[in-house]
């Protein structure tokens, strides 16, 4: 509802609003509604396979002059099938790719040389978190989870790929960034980051 209010303040109107479970793939009726309402931008929380089904339904009704914006549930390799189906496909994600960090390229080169494949999605965060966890254990001088958690809140943890990891008192990562990506040429390309706008 906050997004709707913000859009109204920008003199933009939400003309179609629907909710679906995480399995629905029958979107023919919705596609007709979107066409009738002349929707140009679709903001979605659908999974990738659902978003693809929606785009296919939009093609059936010849309503392809639209852009789709989703979250990291559509920032997948499967969504590359959406190329050319509509005017634009965008995704936001708090998981920035390793190549977007200055030390990401050497990390990727070493990883691929060692394992002959790229790391799993977000794997560099797991790699970095092991360094931070190790530092917290050393600072806590204990293996007790509560002591480690307390230590993690008090350190500026060195993370070899992303730089640092710090947390607030609720356990949320401080200074996390969200990337906005566009599907172009079969790849997700970073368009902007929240820490740089």
Labelled PLM ranges:
Residues 1-197:
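Extracytosolic ligand-binding ectodomains
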């Amino acid at each position: 509802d906050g997004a709707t209010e913000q859009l109204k303040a920008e003199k933009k109107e939400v003309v179609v609003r629907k909710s679906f479970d995480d399995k629905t793939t029958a979107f023919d009726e919705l596609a007709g509604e979107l066409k009738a309402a002349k929707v140009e931008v679709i903001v979605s929380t659908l999974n990738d396979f659902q978003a693809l089904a929606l785009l296919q339904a939009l093609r059936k009704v010849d309503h392809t002059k639209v852009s789709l914006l989703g979250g990291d549930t559509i920032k997948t390799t499967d969504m590359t099938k959406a190329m050319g189906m509509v005017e634009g496909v965008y995704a936001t994600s708090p998981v920035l790719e390793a190549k977007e960090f200055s030390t990401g390229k050497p990390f990727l080169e070493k990883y691929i040389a060692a394992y002959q494949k790229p790391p799993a999605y977000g794997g560099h965060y797991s790699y970095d978190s092991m360094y931070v966890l190790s530092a917290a254990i050393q600072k806590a001088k204990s293996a007790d989870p509560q002591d480690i958690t307390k230590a993690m809140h008090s350190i500026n943890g060195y993370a070899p790929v992303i730089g640092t990891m710090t947390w607030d008192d609720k356990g949320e990562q401080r200074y996390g960034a969200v990337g906005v990506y566009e599907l172009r040429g079969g790849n997700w390309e970073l368009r902007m980051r929240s820490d740089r706008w």
